[in-house]
């Protein structure tokens, strides 16, 4: 019995010795145990560099990774796997989390640049309006008109003024003017009325100053250009227009919102994000284009952007070429040239062209506030033709030599103003914001 007990004890001792050896061997392979530091707030997790004397601490060369997420129960929720992830991305900028909203343009959250471009949802901002190049000021126009009416011509030259029947006049003081001889008197009448309508709407900065003159071979103004008059085959006594000649004009291409190749217009409005990614210069351009579209609708001018829309049926790239009768001055202002098709002739054929003019107008839902106010004022007064003719009569001495606006055309002008006013109010009701309106 004793021998058996001693054998069992020896066997147990050998097993315990073997087990202890294994544990010692295993313990030697394990790294020393590291204690977690005491819990501290997340902002203290990274060591701080001592500030240099005489100034603030220098900014880190690379952006520091974001602090680890903190568990209020005391300890980091990030694991070694998370630390590996941070280490792998340390050479680049921190990734954007899925929950963080990305910066994009939408109707609900417009970019600051777009918000600054429009106020009240439908009006160009005052800041943009102030950046529109000045064009022709009232004082400049008045001075030029006074000089042109009394100036003597020393040359009449072909070219530089559009149609072959027109001439480029040079005055004794060296200034020049385009002399437009209409195929019929209504073209000169339409151009003169268009100029004064532009003044009535506050758009005169875009339309060259215009004066009327009578062709009189024996008159003082024409005395030195007798030969040129005979070569031009102008009828004695005809009324022509003198408009200020502008050097260094450049062609203008339709901006992207209307550069359609499929005949469909893309509406220009603030709410739809159409102003996204446009530069300041492009926005300033659009301010001028919206005025042009309103002006051409009111005058029923078919010889500018509307003619491009008409040509799309056989020329899908016409919108990528220069727009007729529209140029840019050296200062950047758009110049609305050759408005002979406006009002009189344009009104006679309005039924043919309004299928282009009306959709073009309805593609615009952002306006210059001053222009919109003038339109609404003329709509409320219901006296647009009377006010236009008063302005024309007051500033043009030869007003009686051309027929006044016929009653049917006067009524059509008022109807077009009413249509435009309703469109502005519709845009304001649909896209306007009460704050700032």
UniProtKB/Swiss-Prot annotation:
Residue ranges, annotated region (Disordered): 33-66, 88-116
Main location: secreted
GO biological process: cell-cell signaling; retina layer formation
Cellular location(s): Secreted
Bias type Pro residues, positions: 57-66
Family according to the record: Belongs to the FJX1/FJ family.
Residues the record marks as carrying a glycan: 248
Entries under InterPro entries matching the protein: FJX1/FJ
Protein's name in the database: Four-jointed box protein 1
Domain of life: Eukaryota
Gene Ontology CC entries for this record: extracellular space
Span of the signal peptide: 1-24
Gene (UniProt): FJX1
């Amino acid at each position: 019995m004793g021998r058996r007990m001693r054998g069992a004890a020896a066997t147990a001792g050998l097993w315990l010795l073997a087990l202890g050896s294994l544990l010692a061997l295993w313990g030697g392979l394990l790294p020393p145990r590291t204690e977690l530091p005491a819990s501290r707030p997340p902002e203290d997790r990274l060591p701080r560099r001592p500030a240099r004397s005489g100034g603030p601490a220098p900014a880190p060369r690379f952006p520091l990774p974001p602090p680890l997420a903190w568990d209020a129960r005391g300890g980091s929720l990030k694991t070694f796997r998370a630390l590996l992830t941070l280490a792998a991305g340390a050479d680049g900028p921190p990734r954007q989390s899925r929950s963080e909203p990305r910066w994009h343009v939408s109707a609900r959250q417009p970019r600051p640049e777009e918000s600054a471009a429009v106020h009240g949802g439908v009006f160009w901002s005052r800041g943009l309006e102030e950046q529109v190049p000045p064009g022709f000021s009232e004082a400049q126009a008045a001075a030029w008109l006074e000089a042109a009416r009394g100036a003597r011509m020393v040359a009449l030259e072909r070219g530089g003024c559009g149609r072959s029947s027109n001439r480029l006049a040079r005055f004794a003081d060296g200034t020049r003017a385009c002399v437009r001889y209409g195929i019929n008197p209504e073209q000169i009448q339409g151009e003169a009325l268009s100029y004064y309508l532009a003044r009535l709407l506050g758009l005169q900065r875009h339309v060259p100053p215009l004066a009327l003159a009578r062709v009189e071979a024996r008159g003082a103004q024409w005395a030195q250009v007798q030969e040129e008059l005979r070569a031009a085959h102008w009828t004695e006594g005809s009324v022509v227009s003198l408009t200020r000649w502008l050097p260094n004009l450049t062609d203008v291409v339709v901006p992207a919102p209307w550069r359609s190749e499929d005949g469909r217009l893309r509406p220009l409005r603030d709410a739809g994000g159409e102003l996204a990614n446009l530069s300041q210069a492009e926005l300033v351009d659009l301010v001028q284009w919206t005025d042009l579209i309103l002006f051409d609708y009111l005058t029923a001018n078919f010889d500018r952007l509307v003619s491009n829309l008409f040509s799309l049926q056989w020329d899908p790239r016409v919108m990528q070429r220069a727009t007729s009768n529209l140029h840019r001055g050296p200062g950047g202002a758009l110049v609305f040239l050759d408005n002979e098709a406006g009002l009189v002739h344009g009104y006679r054929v309005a039924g043919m062209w309004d299928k282009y003019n009306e959709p073009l107008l309805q593609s615009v839902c952002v306006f210059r506030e001053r222009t919109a106010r003038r339109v609404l004022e003329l709509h409320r007064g219901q006296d647009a033709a009377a006010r236009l003719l008063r302005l024309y009569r007051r500033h043009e001495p030869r007003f009686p030599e051309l027929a006044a606006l016929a009653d049917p055309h006067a009524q059509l002008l008022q109807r077009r103003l009413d249509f435009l006013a309703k469109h502005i109010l519709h845009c304001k009701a649909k896209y306007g914001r009460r704050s700032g309106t």
